[in-house]
Amino acid sequence: MALKQEMAKSLLKTASLSGRTKLLHQTGLSLYSTSHGFYEEEVKKTLQQFPGGSIDLQKEDNGIGILTLNNPSRMNAFSGVMMLQLLEKVIELENWTEGKGLIVRGAKNTFSSGSDLNAVKSLGTPEDGMAVCMFMQNTLTRFMRLPLISVALVQGWALGGGAEFTTACDFRLMTPESKIRFVHKEMGIIPSWGGTTRLVEIIGSRQALKVLSGALKLDSKNALNIGMVEEVLQSSDETKSLEEAQEWLKQFIQGPPEVIRALKKSVCSGRELYLEEALQNERDLLGTVWGGPANLEAIAKKGKFNK
């Protein structure tokens, strides 16, 4: 009996590892399926009914992409169409083999005020809320797993879902006058785009509970003190702060795309997978760069790195 139980545990763990590996690496794989009551095409049709704004993507020759949340008349709130466009841009970025880094920003010097209330008012049932929740969790999880080093450039306000989006980025930078606020409690809800889970990982459970239950207004100084952001930029000017963010990001993406992308994938697997599976993935990723052009060039130079 004990042997059978041990075998069952082993099989369960193997199945779980296999599922998690597929989840991490299979492009287009959804967190949810019809078995969870999630019908993606139906959700897309619903979201299509709420137009407004756009998600704009600019891909630079230096391997940095700039993703702009563009709905300034509503503080860059997400309309239904913008949610759909965000998924489209994530898929495009998944296939951008020359990409190394990504900056997420809002148009007109403000980040985002979250969901467009016009859409929210029309999606009033718990079933509606959970459907959008699953759609955005899918999208932002795929975003988080992009093989690009991502930075949220917080200019102005990041409210509600906008604050949640910042947590899907690898790093966050704020301008001196900007603020982040998880305002969900004041709306009678909780974060539902994965923001709670990611916030706990970023600042710890105690700080996350304070930030969420207090609906705290985090200015740049407070956000820096609790580890929410990496740095406060010098300028609040829209153009200058974007230039600062680009310079900040460049220090982490020096090198060939295949190496930067492998590093990001390895970190993702280390965060999300069991130890054995993460180590195997690290091995497989090493195989994609060992003996490659960058590796051979570094060996030929016989560089010293302890200076």
Swiss-Prot record:
Gene3D superfamilies from the UniProt entry: 2-enoyl-CoA Hydratase, Chain A, domain 1
Broadest EC class assigned to this enzyme: lyase
Subcellular location: Cytoplasm, Cytosol
Predominant place of localization: cytoplasm
InterPro entries, per database record: ClpP/crotonase-like_dom_sf, Enoyl-CoA_hyd/isom_CS, Enoyl-CoA_hydra/iso
GO molecular function, one term: methyl/ethyl malonyl-CoA decarboxylase activity
Gene Ontology BP, a term: fatty acid beta-oxidation
Pfam families associated with the record: ECH_1 (PF00378)
Modified residues (N6-succinyllysine): K217, K301
Reaction(s) this enzyme catalyzes, per UniProt: (2S)-ethylmalonyl-CoA + H(+) = butanoyl-CoA + CO2; (S)-methylmalonyl-CoA + H(+) = propanoyl-CoA + CO2; (2R)-ethylmalonyl-CoA + H(+) = butanoyl-CoA + CO2
EC number: 4.1.1.94
Modified residues (N6-acetyllysine): K217
Keywords from the named record: Acetylation, Cytoplasm, Lyase
Gene Ontology CC: one annotated term: cytosol
Function comment: Decarboxylates ethylmalonyl-CoA, a potentially toxic metabolite, to form butyryl-CoA, suggesting it might be involved in metabolite proofreading. Acts preferentially on (S)-ethylmalonyl-CoA but also has some activity on the (R)-isomer. Also has methylmalonyl-CoA decarboxylase activity at lower level.
Family: Belongs to the enoyl-CoA hydratase/isomerase family.
Name of the protein: Ethylmalonyl-CoA decarboxylase
Protein source organism: Homo sapiens
Gene name linked to the record: ECHDC1
